[in-house]
Amino acid sequence: MPNHTQNTLELTGNPQTVMAFVDQMGKHMDFEKVIPPPANMFRENLRRQDVERCAREGIPTWQDWQRKHWGTKWNAYQTEDVVVQKWSVNFTTATYRFQTAWDAPRPVIAAIIKQNPDIEVSGGYVLEGYEGCGSFYGMT
């Protein structure tokens, strides 16, 4: 059983840009929409060429792949519905709250920042038992 990490991700910017992100992501944070896993990675019985390819790329299991590319064991869970606040005609914030296993999803946050240069990304995380915390602001 992992230590759970509580994450809050805020995306702020032009309403059309922020809402385009929300429309693409949906009500809940889903790492597969940011960094999609290989389609064949999750088959119960991998073919020999799949096993060889995974071994060659150093990602033989779904758990190893997700930890490498998402920074956490599983996709987001215990997610809350996104909260959208329209502050003005030119300013909107979308807030996603979710948990992750063991750590914050740093590669996912970095990918969101890279994929959405016109949105300011902030927020942060707290590890279960307050064993650590950090900010997403300015992460690249």
Enumerate the predicted regions with their spans.
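Long, contiguous binding/interaction regions
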Residues: M1-T140
